[in-house]
Amino acid sequence: VPVDPTNMLDTMYNFATSTTVYDPYGNTHTATIAFRKRPDLPEQVDAATGLPIPGTGVRNQWEYYMMLDGASLGQVPGTQIAVGGGFLQFTDDGKLIAATSGSFEAQPGGVGPDGQPLPAGPPRLVPQPVDPASGVPQFAVPFNGEEPIILGVHLGDGFNPDDPTDPRTGLDGITQFAGRYNVLRTSADGNPSGSLDNIYVESDGTVTGVFDSGYTRPIGRIVLTKFDNSGKL
């Protein structure tokens, strides 16, 4: 089934998992990451030499999509909308090599044999560079139809199977093994909205606020000083 990012159905992907994320106001939303296996294809053959062309085959590759309910994006509630996605590459023994970023782009329709224009095809996921500062795929999410904020997705640290000195294992995040799909752990940063419930002052003068959401953070600092003879102040 072709992927339609404006109306993602469960027939368009193999597996999915969800986690809670927060908009700029602290409201909670459910973000779902869905995974779709790409068909394994053999390498193309050079017609002149009869030899396989390296890098032309597809093996152990997946696409993934970040989806939110339309209500979270100021659109039709109950509709799963993909705000972006990317590509996963694994080794034959299931280790992650790379998790890259991608965006959806419309496919032009072209012109038919009779010279008449053909309708545009469904949007296609195309690779995009990963943000070098964060090192993880990032997606612009327009919560409630407002100015987009950036959400990053860390699926694991891929490793280089051709470099024996690479300290990364490719096993710290998502993997591809035989057996049933299983989610061991997900986490997300961010916090819900909360009201200031209590404050306390650290020994260095830092004023820490405790919010009823359970979140704790520094909110100020008091300048402290010490006098040798406080009685002469």
Task: Report the location of each language-model feature.
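S/T-rich, low-complexity, solvent-exposed segments of bacterial secretion/appendage proteins
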Residues: V1-L233
